[in-house]
Structure formats: C-alpha cells, structure tokens
C-alpha cells in the first residue's frame, strides 16, 4: 500500500511540474500520443537509470576506466559485416559468404518496392521468428518502460529505435542473409482519397484492416499478451505521414527539435512542440490502431518494424542533409532533468542494450557498414513509380506516388489516365476487379535458419549459434577477485553491468574458475588482429590463452583494493582542453562534474577516448553516477553555493561555474558553452606552442 501511495504522490507532483498540456494538441490523434508520451515519462522517471554512484573497484597503481571494450561478445553488438560474418559462421570478412549465400550491407527498400519473391521470403522469415519465439522476445522489449526508459519521451527516441530495428533486421538475416527490413512509407497510402482502400490491407501484404487479423501472412498470430490474433482498426483515427510533416522535420536547424524533448517539465527551456518527430511518428501508429495504438502492444504487429524503418530513414535524410559527418556523431541536446528523464541523457545506458549508451545510436557505422536506404518512390521512375503496386498520381497537384487500390476503392478523382486500381479498372468511380483475381500468397517451405536460438531467460536475448556461443562475459580480468571480496554486494551498480558472469547476472557456458582458457570462439582470431593490445581489459579476462596471460593469475594482477575514489596515482592525461595540466587525484566522493566544459568534452567523445580523467572529473556527463539534484537547469546544485560565491570562489574554483550556475551567474546555452570551451582549446594550444619555443 505504501508503494502505491508513493507512486500516486509522484504522479501528482509530475502533473504539477509538467508544462505539457495535452489538451492543446492540434488533433485528437496527437492528443492520444501526447498522453502516451507523458505516461511513459512518468513511469521512466520513477525508475531511474542508475540507483547510485558507479564506483569502480580499484587496482593498486592503476586508474580504472569504467568503459566497455569495443569487442562484440554477441551478434547484436556487431556494427559491421565482418563481425556478423563471424557470428553467422561465414567466410570472407566484409565480403562474407554464409552457406553459399552472400551476407553484405543491405539496401532497405519501400515495402511495395520488393519483388514478389522478396516479399514472400520476408513474410516467411517473420513467421519463422514467430514460431521459434525470437519475434516475441524482442517485441516485449518495447513494452518495458522500466527496462527501456529511453525508448520514448525524449531525445534518445530516434537512436534507441535505430538500434531496436537493427536487431530485428539481424534476426531476419539469421533466417535469410539476403533479406533486409523494408520501410513502410505511409504517405503513399495517405495520398489516396481513402487510405483504407490501399492494397496494403490485402492477403498479399499485411492482411485484415479491421478487427482480428485472420487473413494474410500474419493471420492468427498470438500476441505476447496471449491474445489469439493481432488487432487493427485502420483509419478509425490518425493518418499516415504527410509531406508537410516530413518537410518540417527535414527543415529543422536545431538538433533539439529532432532529438527532441517531447515531455518537458516546468523550467525546461524548450517549449512543447507537437511537430517534433516523436509526435508525428505517432500518427501512423494511431492510424493502424488495434495493437499499434498502444506503446506496450505496438510491436506485436509486423508493420511496426517497417514503420520504424521509415522513421529511421527520415532521420537519416536529416542527418545527411543538415549535418556534417562529425556532427552526426556528436550533436545531442544538453542533459537536463527538467526536460527529460535521466534515461535520455547522452551518456546514459541505452537499456536494455547495454553496454551501449544513447550516444552510440548516433554512430555513422550503422549506415556506413550495415544498411543504407533506397530513395523513396518517385514519379521519375515512370507511371508505376517503379513498382506494380504503385502509380503516379497526376490529378492532385504536383505528380506524386501513391499505392494502388483494391476492389471498391474510390478512384473517382483520378482524371489523368492513372492506373490506380490493382488488377482491375476504374468504373463509375470505383475500382472493379478484372479477370485476374487476387489470390492468397503461395505456400512456401520454411527457410532453414542460418543460426538456431536457445532461450536463457525471459528478459534478455541470447543467441545460440551452430558452434554455440554465449554472451555472458565479464568486461575486466579483475571481476573474479572483486567478486570474491564481496564487490557484487557492496557495489552492485558497477559490478552487475561490468562483471555479469562473476556476479551471476547470467549463466556462462564455460568454466568461470579456469585460470587459463579462451572463453570465446573468436579469441585466436582477435589475438592475431592485435586485440590483446587494443582491448587489454576484455581480452585479458576472456582470451587469456590466446593473449598469453596464463603466467600471472588474476588475483596477482588485481591485488590492492579500495574504490576508484581512492586512486592516488592516476596516469591518464586529462583532455587536451584542460589547459595541458596533468590529471589530479579522483578524490571527490560526490556526483558532480568538476568543470563547466564537461558536457562539451563528453559530446566530443572524451568519455571514451580519455576515460581515466573523464570518469573522475566529469561523472555526470559520462553517466558514471546519478546526481541527487536536478541536473541541467540554471540553478545552484549545492546549498552552500551562495556563501561560496560571496567569498569569491566563482573565480578561484573551476567547480563553481558548473555547479553554482545561479550564484556565479554562469548560465549559458549549449552553443555558448561550446564556444567558451573551444576558446579554452585555442588558448591551451597557444600556451603549448609558447612552451615549445
């Protein structure tokens, strides 16, 4: 009872603090989306991303970097084809061949641009994943606000879904390596007089439009909630994407209007905006209705994945047209708890996809290495827009592509010879079927999966390959000794993530007590490619034999103790922006940034390139701890700030401008801060040049 009272009080406080008034939404559909976004934000804020400070167990004489190695320990962590090739047991690296079939970078096409063979194989791959349980296990992730806090209601919405969709595409490619996850451009359906007339809602494509889906390739799919079938209510409310919505997104110049604060609270400097991508993406959800209407059930419907593939395409179009290559990987709104939950902070873990962080979803590697997008269908391809399922509409202003209509569709307004009716003709303003009747898709034999799947738990995905590989690894060779000293209980926030195997957060398929062994099938290959030196922490723990680490035990290497805060002789240099000074001891037990430039340094990747300094001096910006104050606004983060400011500490102590913003009068926006920190870089370089002379 007490727990429910606390939650009720929290939600009442949230209502008071929220500056988002859903009653002002421009349409009923956006109002529905607004309420859903607000509910998700409430629940996510009630389940913080970190439950306490992350304190790395110490090693005598060493500064421990609280960061993961870039080695992919399971297939979902892969970011290039060479990595996928290893897990798919193929040959050829980036020119991979798996069981005689090529495995390469894919080009995602619009769903109606697929050939009949491609579409049928895609449907079969979805059915295979449904039958073996992998579809449902991934779909459940989208419903878990406590485990997937960054999925909605803030700036991580687009990066989080990019990774989520990537994982479904990997599952599809495990069934058929030549396939990709197409995108559904709902504007093609919206361009019809009545979008419900689209052939999308027929046996050949998505099946029933209303009620339970009992025909088509996904008929009688039991949902993760154990309902007998997917449900839809196409066109009851909402609509598909419009060109105006797309152009509004592509025309933005402020990243905070793309990676947007969709549920801001009072005090957030960004006002509510119902035109940001998270809101406009909701229209097609509500238009399809049924399971797609609610966040918790949307992923039951396969059209969810194609819709989010299109959302990802729009984001990539923005990235390519408005951002430089470098900016694509760094531009992210400033962390501010008055604007979003901590789950959306730049350096927060992208749960449940740890060890990824939200900023990792900005990586160019997705579209450099894994997939690209075919252009949206265009009338430049001719009267059929390049597909037998589309046509070029010349009767409603500028030529535009639209999807063809099923029998009884309203074709009366097409006056310029368009072939708008699929396998039929327009008679008296209605589509009439011709001599060819639309037939159900042919039955095809299930494709033999490239990999097989074993379930280890209900909450996380583990892939079992033909040569069986686990994803249960420690990230550091000291995890075992730390665990033996009780760190799993003393320091669970760090240990349960970085030392999963030793803290029994998962079940390894190897003998964790062996001192000299290779725990991963790929250890020998990684050793030959230099990973023992590039990624010594992970490799020294999991590839000890291949890295020739057997001559010294883990316990001998990891002698000493204490926490990261007690490290007295760190050797890591600070960022170049820190006036060229050596690192100082990490002696602050509190959760603060020590420098006003920490957010900018974090944006520039210093948390990873220089973790020894950053995880000590920039704890908040690097996601190392959870502050017990509201980080982000123009405020004082310590109750003594005013007194310290009166004593002149604002000019003496670099800690003050960051944490006593109001008392020190150092409130700046992200652009001003970036300029200020850039000046420090120039000054540092100038002083270094003088010293050299």
Swiss-Prot record:
For Cu cation A, which residues are the binding ones? 142, 152, 161
Q: Which residues bind Cu cation B?
A: 281, 285, 308
Q: Which Gene3D superfamilies match?
A: Di-copper center containing domain from catechol oxidase (1.10.1280.10)
Alphabetized GO MF terms? metal ion binding; monooxygenase activity
InterPro entries in UniProt: Di-copper_centre_dom_sf, ShKT_dom, Tyrosinase/Hemocyanin, Tyrosinase_Cu-bd
Q: Which cofactor does it need?
A: Cu(2+)
What is the residue range of the signal peptide feature? 1-18
Domain named ShKT: which ranges?
472-506, 516-550, 591-625, 634-667
Q: Listed disulfide bonds for this chain?
A: 472-506, 479-499, 488-503, 516-550, 523-543, 532-547, 591-625, 598-618, 607-622, 634-667, 641-660, 650-664
Q: Which regions form coiled coils?
A: none
Which PROSITE patterns does the entry mention?
SHKT, TYROSINASE_1, TYROSINASE_2
Keyword vocabulary terms for this entry: Copper, Disulfide bond, Metal-binding, Monooxygenase, Oxidoreductase, Repeat, Signal
UniProt entry tagged with the keyword Translocase: no
What detail does the entry give on cofactor binding? Binds 2 copper ions per subunit.
Q: In this record, what's one Pfam family?
A: Tyrosinase
Which family would the database say this protein is a member of?
Belongs to the tyrosinase family.
What name appears for this protein in its UniProt entry? Putative tyrosinase-like protein tyr-3
Q: Which gene encodes it?
A: tyr-3
């Amino acid at each position: 009872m007490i727990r429910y009272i606390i939650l009720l009080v929290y939600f009442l406080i949230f209502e008071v603090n929220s500056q988002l008034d859903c009653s002002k939404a421009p349409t009923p559909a956006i109002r529905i989306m607004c309420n859903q976004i607000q509910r998700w934000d409430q629940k996510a804020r009630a389940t913080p991303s970190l439950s306490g400070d992350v304190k790395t167990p110490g090693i005598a004489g060493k500064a421990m970097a609280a960061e993961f190695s870039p080695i992919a320990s399971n297939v979902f962590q892969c970011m290039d084809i060479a990595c996928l090739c290893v897990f798919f047991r193929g040959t050829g690296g980036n020119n991979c061949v798996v069981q005689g079939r090529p495995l390469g970078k894919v080009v995602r096409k619009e769903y109606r641009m697929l050939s009949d063979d491609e579409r049928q194989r895609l449907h079969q791959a979805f059915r295979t994943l449904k039958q073996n349980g992998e579809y449902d296990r991934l779909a459940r992730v989208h419903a878990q606000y406590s485990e997937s806090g960054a999925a909605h209601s803030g700036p991580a919405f687009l990066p989080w879904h990019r990774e989520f969709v990537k994982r479904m595409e990997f599952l599809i490619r495990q069934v058929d390596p030549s396939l990709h996850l197409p995108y559904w451009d709902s504007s093609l359906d919206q361009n019809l007089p009545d979008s419900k007339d689209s052939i999308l809602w027929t046996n050949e494509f998505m099946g029933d439009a209303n009620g339970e889906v009992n025909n088509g390739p996904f008929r009688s799919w039991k949902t993760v909630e154990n309902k007998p079938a997917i449900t839809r209510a196409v066109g009851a409310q909402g609509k598909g994407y419009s060109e105006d919505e797309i152009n509004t997104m592509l025309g933005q110049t402020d990243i905070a209007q793309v990676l947007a604060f969709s549920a801001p609270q009072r005090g957030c400097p960004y006002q509510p905006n119902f035109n940001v991508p998270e809101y406009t993406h909701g229209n097609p959800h509500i238009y399809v209705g049924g399971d797609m209407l609610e966040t918790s059930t949307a992923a039951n419907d396969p059209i969810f994945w194609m819709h989010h593939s299109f959302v990802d395409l729009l984001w990539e179009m923005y990235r390519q047209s408005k951002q430089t290559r470098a900016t694509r990987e760094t531009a992210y709104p400033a962390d501010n708890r008055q604007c979003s939950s901590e789950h959306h902070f730049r350096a927060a873990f992208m749960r449940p996809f740890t060890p990824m962080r939200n900023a990792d979803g900005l990586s160019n590697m997705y579209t450099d290495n894994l997939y690209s997008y075919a252009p949206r269908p265009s009338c430049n391809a001719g009267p059929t827009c390049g597909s037998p399922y589309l046509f070029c509409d010349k009767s409603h202003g500028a030529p535009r592509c639209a999807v063809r209509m099923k029998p009884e569709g309203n074709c009366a307004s097409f006056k310029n010879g368009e072939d708008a009716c699929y396998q039929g003709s327009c008679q008296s303003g209605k589509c009439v079927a011709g001599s060819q009747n639309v037939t159900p898709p042919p039955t095809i034999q299930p494709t033999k999966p490239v990999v097989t799947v074993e379930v280890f738990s209900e909450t996380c995905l583990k892939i079992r390959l033909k040569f069986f590989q686990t994803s249960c690894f420690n990230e550091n060779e000291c995890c075992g000794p730390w665990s033996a000293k009780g760190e799993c209980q003393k320091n669970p926030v760090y240990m349960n993530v970085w030392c999963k195997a030793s803290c029994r957060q998962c079940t390894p398929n190897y003998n964790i007590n062996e001192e000299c062994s290779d725990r991963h099938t790929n250890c020998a290959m990684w050793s030959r490619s230099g990973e023992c030196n590039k990624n010594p922490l992970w490799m020294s723990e999991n590839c000890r034999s291949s890295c020739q680490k057997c001559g010294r035990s883990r316990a001998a290497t990891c002698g000493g103790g204490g926490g990261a805060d007690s490290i007295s002789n760190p050797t890591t240099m600070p960022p170049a922006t820190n006036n060229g000074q050596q690192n100082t001891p990490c002696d602050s037990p509190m959760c603060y940034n020590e420098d006003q430039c920490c957010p900018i340094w974090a944006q520039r990747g210093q948390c990873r390139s220089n973790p020894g300094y950053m995880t000590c001096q920039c704890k908040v910006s690097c996601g190392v701890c959870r502050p017990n104050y509201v980080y982000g606004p123009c405020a004082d983060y310590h109750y003594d700030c005013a007194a310290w400011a009166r004593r002149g500490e604002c000019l003496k102590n670099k800690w003050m401008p960051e944490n006593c913003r109001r008392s020190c009068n150092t409130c700046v926006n992200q652009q001003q801060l970036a300029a200020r920190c850039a000046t420090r870089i120039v000054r540092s370089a100038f002083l270094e040049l003088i010293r050299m002379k």
